[in-house]
């Protein structure tokens, strides 16, 4: 157990009395920089970073993801291989072990619900025992399991995957989208996270980037990124609120924009509130109504539930622009009396009634954020809406009532976050020079002290990066080591907050309690990730302490997952190569058979039979295409093409000679006719 040194505390008080408040702040480990000085240091730091190549901005969303890059001074959102500007954050594993990402995964979810993962961002950095995870287990068709480290992982076909891995598969798709556009490898990235993510969730997101093969230069908050997208070309100084209600999380941030400086004043939110909850609420309503009308309970039928889930999401989206929608699902299920169909009309008012409590849950964080930023709603010059759920009229009305002004539609709610991430990438690369971002830590950071009390060292909404040191001592005579538990949260007792990890400082010289002086430094970097170091002031010996959390991914875990991801990438490349070769082969077969039929009178029968044998061999090869390489199929197809070209060349020559013969014969007859006329 540790305690604050009484002697040191007394000296600190004395120093404060004799030297004034500034000295006291230096004495207790405060860095002593004024706000303006901090800004100058930040600018110098940005300018000194040398980043080679393009930096992509990625919004790794709960429901959809988006990628953007800077083109000159403008950010450009990129289209994926399917031609869409956003990609569903869905990953599926088929029975034969194939991995699908994005829309192909979403399309097959109805027939493969148990092995199709969606909204796994809600699990990232979370323990299996978290109440939110336990709630999620009841709502999703796939298996959420306890990993060996106690984290929540998912299972498909007997294989376990961490949420960071699933996120990495989505990031690989975004990376591929960027590379297809850029024409070269995309290595560096800025990835966004919900502002209210804790240290474990931020670290797990960085891990996802590493697994996908990306160098994550910075993790930035989603509302802050959206503010960058909004304010990049604005010259007016103002305070703005960013209301971000996405697929899985809710954030509210209050920012001040002043001469290119984007300073976050406060942030708040709920990491388990979003569009998925709206879908789930509507799904429960539909299932309840269906049971009332037919007596059939759909909760035991995963395939039927997946169809209802997709219909609920579609209805939710339609009701943003229509006052009523129809939900029609024929042959949804069956009982002894025959097939059962779902036919239901749903009005906007009904839907709003179903989700009213969810919308209300966004109000308290907004009020708290304004209170922390010390602003009233009259001080806020603009309210920016981010996230797909903000298209819902009831949400927009709630925001208007809350802030006393109609929200701005200046940014695309689906793309603003990725655009902001790309802008921050431009800042880090030195391409954007007139922007400075000052973000904050969303949660207080501290340690557990005697009696299980949570002692805060860095308060929430402190501008990051930041550092704070404090002197601790032993709680017992002769104590040679101290255990320090690092927590994050706002509750009074340490046990009620998120335990980030704990470490033990050993090798303290035996002494009476309260005598050893151990200076512990807590450091939050620009990604919002926590680092801790300690120094024994008595011996002058300094030690770097690595927080050993009982959860999270180890270095070996990440290395294995990187190899796994590379294996999948190689498999994807081979599959693509094989598909392209098969398409080429089938095209050659079709063209060859068409030409053989067209020129059958000019082709020698024995040569035709040989070519037909070649085609049969090619078809046999295509029948076992899954076990063949793309190169083998391509070579066989090229061989068939060469053989067919030789044969058709023979046919062409024969036709040409026949035409020549018939032409000369016709000329002779014409001359005979002319002779007869003269006679």
From Swiss-Prot:
Phosphoserine: residues bearing it: 408
UniProt keyword terms in alphabetical order: Acetylation, ATP-binding, Chaperone, Cytoplasm, Hydrolase, Methylation, Mitochondrion, Nucleotide-binding, Nucleus, Phosphoprotein, Transit peptide
Any GO CC annotation of this UniProt entry: mitochondrion
Reaction catalysed by this enzyme: ATP + H2O = ADP + phosphate + H(+)
Residues modified as Omega-N-methylarginine: 513
Compartments where found: Mitochondrion; Nucleus, Nucleolus; Cytoplasm; Mitochondrion matrix
GO biological process: one example: negative regulation of hemopoiesis
Annotated stretches, region: Nucleotide-binding domain (NBD): 63-431
N6-malonyllysine, modified sites: 206
Region (Interaction with FXN and ISCU) residue spans: 432-679
Biased composition (Basic and acidic residues): 669-679
GO molecular function: ATP binding; ATP hydrolysis activity; ATP-dependent protein folding chaperone; ubiquitin protein ligase binding; unfolded protein binding
CDD domains: ASKHA_NBD_HSP70_HSPA9
Coiled coil ranges: none
EC number: 3.6.4.10
Function field: Mitochondrial chaperone that plays a key role in mitochondrial protein import, folding, and assembly. Plays an essential role in the protein quality control system, the correct folding of proteins, the re-folding of misfolded proteins, and the targeting of proteins for subsequent degradation. These processes are achieved through cycles of ATP binding, ATP hydrolysis, and ADP release, mediated by co-chaperones. In mitochondria, it associates with the TIM (translocase of the inner membrane) protein complex to assist in the import and folding of mitochondrial proteins.
Protein name: Stress-70 protein, mitochondrial
Organism: Pongo abelii
Gene name of the encoded protein: HSPA9
